[in-house]
Amino acid sequence: MYDYIKGQLTKITAKYIVVETNGLGYIINVANPYSFTDSVNQLVTIYLHQVIREDAHLLFGFHTEDEKDVFLKLISVSGIGPTTALAIVAVDDNEGLVNAIDNSDIKYLMKFPKIGKKTAQQMVLDLAGKFVEAPQETGNTKARSNKAGNTQLDEAIEALLALGYKAAELKKIRAFFEGTSETAEQYIKSALKLLMKG
C-alpha cells in the first residue's frame, strides 16, 4: 500500500492526473483533476489509496489527508465503490455530507451519482457519528485568472461525466453556464453545488 506520492505533475485529463517520480508516470484518479492546474510541471504531494482488482491496479489521489479519510469512510459502506466515493468527495462539501449523514437526510444523499435509497440508508447506518469533526474544505481553492470559455466548460462537463453524472443533467448545467468565463475547476465546483441543490 501507498500513503502518498511526491513527484512532478506532468498531465491533467478529465478523469486523472499523472505524477512522475523516478522516471515512472503514475496515473492517479482524482475527484477534480482541474484543481491541480496551477501545479503542472511542479513538485506535488498527493495522498493515495490503492485499489487492486483482478484486471487493474488503481490509484486514487487526494489533496489532503482529511479528503482521503472521507473517501476511506465512504468506501467502507456496502454499495459504495471507489468511483462513487470519489464523486462524493468531488462535491467539496464535507460539512453538508456529514450533516446529511448525522441527520438521516436520505434525500440529500440520493443526489450523489449512483446513490439510491438503500445505499443512502446504509451510509446513515454505517457512518452516523463517525465524523468527529467536519473535515477541512478539500481541494485547491485558490482563485486564479486563467483563459476560460467554452473549452473550460467542455473540460468541466467531461470531468462531471467521468464522475458519473448523467448527460441530461449536464445539459442543463451547460445551458446555465453558457456565456460565463471561469476555469474548469470553478465550473466543476459550481456545477456540483447546483447538482446537489437539485
From Swiss-Prot:
State any GO CC term.
Answer: cytoplasm
SMART domains xref list:
HhH1 (SM00278)
What's the main place this protein lives?
A: cytoplasm
BP-aspect Gene Ontology terms? DNA recombination; DNA repair
Question: Where is region (Flexible linker) located?
Answer: 143-147
Region of interest (Domain I), residue spans: 1-63
Where does the record place the region Domain II? 64-142
Q: Does the keyword Ribonucleoprotein apply?
A: no
Subcellular location per UniProt equals: Cytoplasm
Q: Name one GO molecular function term.
A: four-way junction helicase activity
Sum up the protein's function in the record's words.
The RuvA-RuvB-RuvC complex processes Holliday junction (HJ) DNA during genetic recombination and DNA repair, while the RuvA-RuvB complex plays an important role in the rescue of blocked DNA replication forks via replication fork reversal (RFR). RuvA specifically binds to HJ cruciform DNA, conferring on it an open structure. The RuvB hexamer acts as an ATP-dependent pump, pulling dsDNA into and through the RuvAB complex. HJ branch migration allows RuvC to scan DNA until it finds its consensus sequence, where it cleaves and resolves the cruciform DNA.
Swiss-Prot/TrEMBL domain comment? Has three domains with a flexible linker between the domains II and III and assumes an 'L' shape. Domain III is highly mobile and contacts RuvB.
The protein's name? Holliday junction branch migration complex subunit RuvA
Naturally occurring in which organism (per UniProt): Streptococcus pyogenes serotype M28 (strain MGAS6180)
